[in-house]
From Swiss-Prot:
Organism: Microcystis aeruginosa (strain NIES-843 / IAM M-2473)
Site residues by UniProt (Interaction with tRNA): 120, 331
Gene: mnmA
Keyword Ion transport recorded: no
Enzyme class: transferase
Active site residues of this protein: 94, 193
Designated name of the protein: tRNA-specific 2-thiouridylase MnmA
Enzyme Commission (EC) number: 2.8.1.13
Range of residues in the leader sequence: none
Function according to Swiss-Prot or TrEMBL: Catalyzes the 2-thiolation of uridine at the wobble position (U34) of tRNA, leading to the formation of s(2)U34.
C-alpha cells in the first residue's frame, strides 16, 4: 500500500487514522509537531499519547520542532490581527502554514514519501472533468472541518489522505475501542490549542498586548463608557460590553486608530454584502464572472445562498440573498457548491 506519514496530535481522531491505515497495510510513520514554547510544553499529554499510540501500533514516531514556525505564523499573526481590530482565524492559517505543507515537505525530504494523512473530518476526490483534486465536506456534518481547510493547495490535496472523512465520530470512537487504543475514551478538545494552554483567549492576548483604555461609543459618537483594549472585543459581541442600555447593544465596529469600540442595536450589526481577500480557489479554477454558491462565514454557521462577484487583486464581493448578522473582518468566508469547497478567503469588511 505504500508509506504514509500520519500527523498525530495524541487525540482519538488521529490515532484512529493511523490505526486504520496500518490495518489496511500501509507502512505508517507517526509525526507529531512540537508547537508550543514554554516550560513543560516539551512533554505535553498529546505528545506522550501520540508516542504511546505509535508504540502500540509498532510504528516509528517522529517529532518535529515547529515552535518557531508556530510563533511566527500563528501567535504573531493573532496578536497583530487583534491589535489591528480584526478577529483572526488561527485554525485555517495553522493548517496551511504550520501543518499540511510543512508535513508534506518533511515527508518528501526526510521520509521519502509523497503521502500524508490526518484525522480531519473532510474528504478529497479527483475530478477528471476539472482535472483537479476537490475538497469536500465530511459525511459527519456535525464534525465537518472543511471550513478550516479551504486554504490548502492542489499539491497538498494530491498528497493527503483523510481516513475519517467517510465515517461519523461515533464510528471513530467504536473503531478506537475495537483497536484497543489508549485514546479511545479521551475527550475531544473543546477550544483552540492556545486557549487550552492559556485558559482564555483574553488571558492569552493580555500576555502580548498592553492594556490601552479607550471609549465605547454609539453610532453617533456619543461616549457610553470605557474599555480596557479593543482586543477584548469582536464584531457581534453582546455579552461583556459593560454598558447598561434600554435595548441590547452589540459591537458593530472596532476602530484601532481612535482606539474605540463602536456599539449599536442588532440591526446595525447586519450586512447585505462583504468583501473577501486572499482568496484561494481550492477545487476550481478562479472564476472570472459572477457565480451562484453558498457561503459559510463562521465555523458553526449554516451555509447561505450568495452571489460571488470576482474582483481584482484576488478578492471577491459576496452579496447575500438575506442580510447576515455579525460579518467579522479576519474570519474566513468559505464558498461551497453543495458539499464541494470551491474556495475561501479572509473577510476584509462588510457593507450595509
Amino acid at each position: 500500500m505504500g508509506k504514509v506519514v500520519v500527523g498525530l496530535s495524541g487525540g482519538v481522531d488521529s490515532s484512529v487514522a493511523a490505526a486504520a491505515l496500518h490495518a489496511q497495510g500501509y507502512d505508517v510513520i507517526g509525526l507529531t509537531l512540537w508547537l508550543m514554547k514554554g516550560k513543560g510544553q516539551c512533554c505535553s499529554e498529546g505528545m506522550v499519547d501520540a508516542a504511546f499510540i505509535c508504540e502500540q501500533l509498532g510504528v516509528p514516531h517522529h517529532i518535529v520542532d515547529s515552535r518557531e514556525l508556530f510563533q511566527k505564523e500563528i501567535i504573531d499573526y493573532l496578536v497583530s490581527g487583534y491589535e489591528a481590530g480584526i478577529t483572526p482565524l488561527p485554525c485555517s492559517q495553522c493548517n496551511k502554514a504550520v501543518k499540511f505543507s510543512p508535513m508534506l515537505h518533511y515527508a518528501r525530504e526526510t521520509l521519502q514519501t509523497d503521502t500524508i494523512a490526518t484525522g480531519h473530518y473532510a474528504r478529497i476526490r479527483f475530478s477528471p472533468e476539472n482535472n483537479r483534486y476537490q475538497l469536500l465536506r465530511a459525511v459527519d456534518q456535525n464534525k465537518d472541518q472543511s471550513y478550516f481547510l479551504y486554504d490548502l493547495t492542489q499539491d497538498v490535496l494530491r498528497g493527503t489522505l483523510f481516513p475519517l472523512g467517510e465515517q461519523t465520530k461515533a464510528e471513530t470512537r467504536r473503531i478506537a475501542q475495537e483497536f484497543g487504543l489508549k485514546t479511545a475514551d479521551k475527550p475531544d478538545s473543546q477550544d483552540l490549542c492556545l486557549i487550552e494552554a492559556h485558559g482564555t483567549m483574553r488571558s492569552f492576548l493580555d500576555k502580548y498586548i498592553a492594556v490601552s483604555e479607550g471609549d465605547i461609543v454609539d453610532l453617533d459618537g456619543k461616549v457610553l463608557g470605557k474599555h480596557s483594549g479593543i482586543h477584548h472585543y469582536t464584531i457581534g459581541q453582546r455579552k461583556g460590553i459593560g454598558i447598561a442600555a434600554a435595548e441590547p447593544l452589540y459591537v458593530v465596529k472596532l476602530d484601532p486608530v481612535m482606539n474605540r469600540v463602536i456599539v449599536g442595536n442588532r440591526e446595525s450589526a447586519v450586512s447585505a454584502a462583504c468583501l473577501v481577500g486572499r482568496m484561494n480557489w481550492v477545487s476550481i479554477a478562479e472564476p472570472t464572472t459572477p457565480i451562484r454558491a453558498q457561503v459559510q462565514v463562521r465555523y458553526r454557521s449554516p451555509a447561505v445562498p450568495v452571489n460571488v462577484i470576482p474582483l481584482e487583486n484576488n478578492q471577491v464581493k459576496l452579496v447575500f440573498d438575506q442580510p447576515q448578522f455579525s460579518i467579522t473582518p479576519g474570519q474566513a468566508a468559505v464558498i461551497y457548491e453543495g458539499e464541494i469547497v470551491l474556495g475561501g478567503g479572509i473577510i476584509s469588511g462588510a457593507t450595509p
